[in-house]
Amino acid sequence: MKAKPLLAALILAAAPAFAAETYTVDKVHSNAQFTIRHLMSKVTGKFTDVEGAIQVDRAKPEASAVEFKIKTASIDTANKQRDDHLRSPDFFDAANNPEITFKSTKMKATGKDSYQVSGTLTIRGVAKEITVPVTLLGEMKDPWGNERVGFEVQTTLNRKDYNILWNKTLDAGGYLLGDDVAVNLTLEAVKKKEEAAK
C-alpha cells in the first residue's frame, strides 16, 4: 500500500525536469529587420526595441510557445526624415499603435532545428493569423554562466494586409513602394535565473 504514495512522490519530484523553461528575450541582442522595394532599389531598416518570452518544452516541443512585442517608435532606417515618416499615420502610426505584437497558438517541429509557428500578428490594430518558419540557431552558456538560445524567422508580409497603404504613383507608371516586405527576426533569449539554477 505504500508503493502508490511513493510512486506519486517520485512523479512529483521528477515533474520540474519536464516543465517548460522560460527564456526572456535579450533586447540588446535581438532585432527585427525588414526590406522593401523603393523605386528600382530596396530600403532596409530595423526595429531595435524587441521584447518577449519563449516557453521551451523539451519533452513536448509542440507545447512550446512564444510571445513578443516590438516598439514601433524604435524603427531605424538610418535616415531621420524617413524614420519620422514611418512613425507617422501614413505608416505605423506609432503614437496610436505603439506596439507590434505576436502570440503563438501552435507550434510544429519540421526538422532537427526547424519549426512552423502559427499565431496572431497585430500591426496597426489589425490582427492576422499567420504561420512562419522558425530556425533554432543554437543553445549555449555565455561567459557569465547564463543559458541562452537563439531563433531566426524569415518571412514575407504584405503591408496592405495591415492597413499600411501609403504610396505614390510614378509618372512612368507603377508605384514608389512595393507591397511585399521581407522580414528577418532574430531573437536571442536567456533562461530565467531561478530556472537556470534548478
Stretches found by the model and what they are:
Residues 19-198:
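Low-complexity, acidic/polar, glycine-enriched regions of mature
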Residues 1-18:
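Gram-negative bacterial Sec-dependent N-terminal signal peptides
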